[in-house]
Amino acid sequence: MAEWHKIIEDISKNNNFEDAAIVDYKTTKNVLAAIPNRTFAKINPGEVIPLITNHNILKPLIGQKFCIVYTNSLMDENTYAMELLTGYAPVSPIVIARTHTALIFLMGKPTTSRRDVYRTCRDHATRVRATGN
């Protein structure tokens, strides 16, 4: 879907965000679009499967780096988002939002609030969900 690259372009233009990626979680579990040469571009299927199957996951590996789960409502149909923090310095907020076919990963800069990252990621996911994807 060409819209994935448009979402990544919009996010990369915003100076509040450090990294973003869109990952298929239904079939191949591969990265569909990402900011090149960043952490989320390295996400592999072995890191996606625990996110969607294990509700009690505490320290998932994302892009070969550990993160700490803050809230997990990823598989909830009303919330469809997970908030995390990087497990390394500098600590940055991360949000993963679920559409019907993909996961949207968004990492804010250390100075960006969790609320801004959450709102932006959920807004993109809500728009994509409205189209049926």
UniProtKB/Swiss-Prot annotation:
GO terms for cellular component: host cell; host cell cytoplasm. Keywords: Actin-binding, Actin-dependent inwards viral transport, Cytoplasmic inwards viral transport, Host cytoplasm, Host-virus interaction, Virus entry into host cell. GO terms for biological process: actin-dependent intracellular transport of virus towards nucleus; symbiont entry into host cell. InterPro entries: PFN, PFN_euk, PFN_sf, Profilin_CS. It is found in: Host cytoplasm. One of its GO terms (molecular function) is actin binding. It holds the Pfam family Profilin. Interacts with host TPM1. Interacts with protein A25. Participates in either intracellular transport of viral proteins or intercellular spread of the virus. Cellular profilins modulate actin filament dynamics (polymerization and depolymerization) via direct binding to actin through an actin-binding domain as well as by modulation of other actin-binding proteins. In contrast to cellular homologs, the poxvirus profilins seem to bind actin only weakly. Belongs to the profilin family. This is Profilin. It comes from Variola virus (isolate Human/India/Ind3/1967) (VARV).
